[in-house]
Each structure stands twice: as C-alpha cells, then as structure tokens.
C-alpha cells in the first residue's frame, strides 16, 4: 500500500473537512514553526508529517517559519539543519522560508496598539518578583504596583526599552488581562523582554524581543494560516492566542488546535536533557545514531519513508501516551526487509579452512534480494579459506543448535555443505582455526544421498574479505521512561554501543554513505555518514532482524 493510498483520518482532518464543507475556509494553510535552538527529533517529525501532510493532501500550503525570538539560544547552524531535515523527510515548504523576526517591526506596532488601548504596561518588577506575584494554581496572583501606569507613561518607557536604556531584567512589557484568572497563562503574561544579544537574522537592530505567545498568533495571522496545529502543552496558551488576536487590528483570525505530543520509550526528547548528553560527551554529538534526532536516526540508517510510516501508524489523537520503541523499529525493519539489498558480513570472525577444496577461487552468483529479482545479483568469490562468525561453531551442542558442530554438517549460504573435522587452538584454549571438508556436489542443491542438513550459516572469503568496523547500536537507556528518573543519566545503557572488528564481502568495498543493507543473519546496517570511507569501512547497526528487547522484558 502506498502512502497516498493509506491517507489517514483523525480529528484534525475531520475539522478541516467540516471547515471546507461549510465554507469557513476555501483552502488549507498550515505551518511548521520550530525554534532554531537545537536539532529536530522524532517528536518534531510527527508535527512535520501532520502539517506538511495535511497541506499536501488538501492541495493547500504549508509554511516553514523559524520562531526566532530568543537570540541567546538560537544559531544559523540549527536553521540549516532544520531545513535539511524537513527536505530529507520528503517535504517542501510553500514559498520562501519565513522568520518570526521578519515581523518584528509589525509586532512592535501591535504592542504599541495594546498600550494605547490600555491593555499592556511596562512592568519593573524583577523576574523573581513577577513569578512571586503570579500566584499558584491554588492562589490568585496579585497586581504589580506598576500595573496602573498611564498610557503615555507606558509608551515612553516602552520606547526607552527599545532604545536600550534599561538593563536586562529591569523592565518588560506585560499584557493587562486578569491576575485572578484560573489560567496562569492569562495572569498578565510578559509580551516583550530585554536581551542584549546579536540576532542571527537581525544583527543588533533590536534589544527587545517578543515572547512566543505574542509572536506566534500574530505570525499565523499575518501568513493567513487557517489551522494552527500544536501539541497539547499549548492548550491553555490558546486562550492567550485568541486574546491577542481579538485585541489588535488584524483581519485574519486563525484557530489553534492541539494534538498529543510523541513520547517515545527508552529515550528523552527534552532539549535540555539532549544537550546534556552532548555536552557531557555521553554521545558523539547531535547526530549520534543513538539520539532521537532526525539526523541521528538518519545516520543510524533509518529511512525517511520509515519515519513517515511510523508517524502514520501512531496517528494523531488528543490524549498523550507512550509509544514503544519497538513500534519505530518495526517500521524500519519492514522498510529495509522490503528494500535493502542483502550482503554477508562476519562481525566476530574465526578462520575456517576447507581442506579437500583445491586452491584458487570460485565465483558464485547471489541474488541481491531473495524476493526481488529486479534488484539483480552480485558476484561473490568463494575459496578454501573463509571466515565464519565465532558464534556459529561449537565443539559440542544440543539438537536445537542448527549451526556448525564438530563432526557434523551445515550449509554455507548460497554455497556448499561443509563438515567440521577438527579445530586448532591457541595457548589460552581459544579456537583459531576450524578445519572442514566439503561436498563438492552440493552447490545450491541437496546431497544426492538424501541426507538432511538443516543449518545455514553466512561466510566471507578470507582471501577477498574487506576489513570493516561494526558499530552495534542499541537503546540509549535501560528503562522505558528515563526522563521520569531523578537522575536520568544513571539509566544509560552501557551496551548502547558495542564496536566489533570483522569483514564484509568485497562487493561492499565501495559502500556509499547511508547505503543500507541487510547483513544476512545479523541485522540491518548502513555505511556511517561521518566515519566510513573506502580506506576505513564503518557500518552502523540500524536494527536487529527481530526485537530482542521483547524477550528481555518478558524474562
């Protein structure tokens, strides 16, 4: 089923259908408004797929707007990474990229309009006093002693704020609403604060910056957004969103709708916590394959299609819930099982010699995908010396062990049946070489005498093997909800990265960055985009062939 055929339905799409049917709107215009203060993560992918997906399905428009109202935390590095992530996920924004900073002059004029209407005032309480005066969920707030300044006085003070005549934290512009409101967001929220910091778009033009709640709704209205979609934590903020638009002179009145945010198990989404992982060098960086960032998932080997499918499967609801990591892993397994070419890699090699096989090599033809002949085949050399995985041999084993056992037979993938005859060990009793014989009449066919050989193992020709590093990534945390722990860093999974040195078949010698494979019997891997090269192959494990954590949780 294609993504187009699997068009989802949810409460937001039902609202849009009704709006179009009643003529409330004649078209659909959404937006994706990230703050450029970090890298996008899988939670943002849900919002991207929703906003851009809705616009695409209804032949509408979706803007990419950077909510760049805090110059202290923002950087052009994040702007560039966000643009790349959106495009990599398969979406294109409508028209030019927007920035909230594009509207700073207009926002300033709207702030003056509120002052002139007696609906905003300059407050000189300290940030700590503002918090104290705001009250709690059980206690109402109390009015600032500066709340009843005259309109003229507020206009003069606001202009002084803009001119840089106040230090940071010494003055701010607040909306005059209701300090006794049951909704704390409506207790005279701050609209502008002072920050002496260079802005990545505006330079040093401004030293006062509008707050998110003031900027967001006006930006939506200026852009003609019909459906402003955001996550549930902004539900109470909708009251302020509507209040601002109702009290300024503006024609367009967008409506905000909230949906549940994505909470994925075995990871954290908080920018503060993610930044701590990077700053403390627990991970390599924002694109570390263990991170839930889009760039991290991409480097690990996740495809854009698998992430879009994941967002489709989890759906859009009004109720927060935790999504199992297995749901995300299932999407990439399904994608790569269908589309990734097969190859052989030995991650923990032990030497195997086929003593009755002549010297030289034999070229075997192997399908790139067992169920897709259109993906073609590749030539793989076979010789009397090969590498197999150390876990695929035992000197003694029970009947459930379907691999190579001393004195017994097994089939080599797409090759011959071999029998283990003897082993050679080092001084520490470690096996260094397995000596075998082979049946030269069993190349891709059963033995003529009818004997049954059930096990199949993979291999790489020792003569032609290409050395490679394998980075076995796993879940970064040992508990499903690390963010709820007192010390989330104490729950780091010590096995989240295991590095192995082994070999791959020669067809992978020129593996391209981010190229994905199914390494037979091992899992899904991709060539690392940062460290892999022709001289030093590095493959990241994207996912195992099956969910090993399901068994762990049951034990």
From Swiss-Prot:
Q: Where in the cell is it found?
A: Cytoplasm
Q: List the disulfide bonds.
A: none
Catalysis: reaction(s): tRNA(Gln) + L-glutamine + ATP = L-glutaminyl-tRNA(Gln) + AMP + diphosphate
Class of enzymatic activity (EC top level): ligase
Q: Where does ATP bind?
A: 35-37, 41-47, 231, 261-262, 269-271
Its predominant location is cytoplasm
Q: Which InterPro entries match?
A: aa-tRNA-synth_I_CS, Gln-tRNA-synth, Gln/Glu-tRNA_Ligase, Gln_tRNA_ligase_bac, Glu/Gln-tRNA-synth, Glu/Gln-tRNA-synth_Ib_cat-dom, Glu/Gln-tRNA-synth_Ib_codon-bd, Glu_tRNA_lig_a-bdl
> Which processes are annotated in GO (biological process)?
glutaminyl-tRNA aminoacylation; glutamyl-tRNA aminoacylation
UniProt superkingdom: Bacteria
Description of how the protein assembles with itself and partners: Monomer.
Q: What name has this protein been given in UniProt?
A: Glutamine--tRNA ligase
Q: What is the lineage of its organism?
A: Bacteria, Pseudomonadati, Pseudomonadota, Gammaproteobacteria, Enterobacterales
**Gene encoding it?**
glnS
